[in-house]
Amino acid sequence: MQDIVREAMERDEAERQTQSSLEDSDDQFGDPRIVIVGAGGAGNNTINRLYNIGVEGADTVAINTDKQHLKMIEADTKILVGKSLTQGLGAGGDPSMGERATEMAQGTIKDVLGDADLVFVTAGMGGGTGTGAAPVVAKIAKEQGAIVVGMVSTPFNVERARTVKAEEGLENLRNEADSIIVLDNNRLLDYVPNLPIGKAFSVMDQIIAETVKGISETITQPSLINLDYADMSTIMNQGGVAVMLVGETQDKNKTQEVVNDAMNHPLLDVDYRGASGGLVHITGGPDLTLKEAEGIASNITERLEAAANVIWGARIQDEYKGKVRVMAIMTGVQSAQVLGPSTQKQADKSRQSIQSRESQQQHSGSEFDSSERAQTAQSGTWSDGGRDEVEKNNGLDVIR
């Protein structure tokens, strides 16, 4: 028996060297096309970070109504939408404006997403462009046959009315995407309360970027126990809310400590008990044992329902000697609460305040004055492109 083990280890080393040379090959046969789309200011910031840290096998696309912000962003493709609506000055916090501007550019977006197999849509919920554009982009990608994953952040409670917009935007995105992963900005107050505001937001950008990078490279880079696009498709088609877990440890008790680290992720606020699907990928050094890898996968999926579909893989990298990293996506979380508890509470409070104010206006006899919007529509601004399959004038409303 010892001879068999020794021979297997010798063969393993030879196979690893052969695999290494194959990885350097330029043969891209069968590789899925992954596109990461950032909509609005927060989404663009994530795209900029992704572009700079690099994601193997994925294209980055930035979409915005704000020309100045878009100029500052680095991406493989940049699209300024709704130029005739906003003059490149942004959506003014109005999701309907962001939605309209993106619909007018759907021909261009279809071209960019044409043969994509997996599309990530990242945005900040609660503003104008991201909230309105993300569901439109998700719908276009879905109609063209791609698996669509939304990766979004929610506003601070102090932003009040924006939490209501965020809730509505999340519901719209959930209706169009296969799965959505939600991160709550309020958790930054607990995680990095004393960082300068710019650096605090960059932490959220980095977490979203690293998550998208991790998922993308899990299915584009070879592994010892491989995960591929078909596995991703199977898990993401479970639908509902998805929960992302990331953990890393150098502790001797890798099996439990890496799971503890993932469970205590500071920016995730959704309970995934009863989820119907799980995708787990483990990265470790040459010292990672089969028992440890299986133990990690088992521990991190124990909260899933008994009949959950779990797919796991493992990759060995020399730089991970003595440590281990786990990334898991739990899908099919059948929770009506997409926002975190604190954000949901603020959204409910803000909605009640808005409804009360509208009720008072109705009782006082005041009516909504739509003359300005009507005048805009009559002047033709709202008619160029419309909801046509392809916008009528690319040069007018889309700048790439």
UniProtKB/Swiss-Prot annotation:
InterPro entries: Cell_div_FtsZ, Cell_div_FtsZ_CS, FtsZ/CetZ, FtsZ_C, Tub_FtsZ_C, Tubulin/FtsZ-like_C, Tubulin/FtsZ_2-layer-sand-dom, Tubulin/FtsZ_GTPase_sf
Subcellular location field: Cytoplasm
Basic and acidic residues biased stretches: 1-16, 385-400
Keywords: Cell cycle, Cell division, Cytoplasm, GTP-binding, Nucleotide-binding, Septation
UniProt KW Mitochondrion keyword: no
GO MF annotations, alphabetized: GTP binding; GTPase activity
Biased composition (Polar residues): 365-382
Swiss-Prot/TrEMBL GO biological process terms: cell division; contractile ring contraction; FtsZ-dependent cytokinesis; protein polymerization
Record-linked Gene3D superfamilies: Tubulin/FtsZ, C-terminal domain, Tubulin/FtsZ, GTPase domain
PROSITE patterns, alphabetized: FTSZ_1, FTSZ_2
Region (Disordered): 1-30, 338-400
SUPFAM superfamilies recorded: Tubulin C-terminal domain-like, Tubulin nucleotide-binding domain-like
Domain of life: Archaea
Effect of residue 231 to A: Defective in cell division inhibiting ring constriction. Is not able to complement the deletion mutant of this gene
Pfam families: FtsZ_C, Tubulin
Subunit organization: Homodimer. Polymerizes to form a dynamic ring structure in a strictly GTP-dependent manner. Interacts directly with several other division proteins. Interacts with SepF.
HAMAP family: FtsZ
Family of the protein in this entry: Belongs to the FtsZ family.
Name of the protein this chain belongs to: Cell division protein FtsZ 2
Species this protein is from: Haloferax volcanii (strain ATCC 29605 / DSM 3757 / JCM 8879 / NBRC 14742 / NCIMB 2012 / VKM B-1768 / DS2) (Halobacterium volcanii)
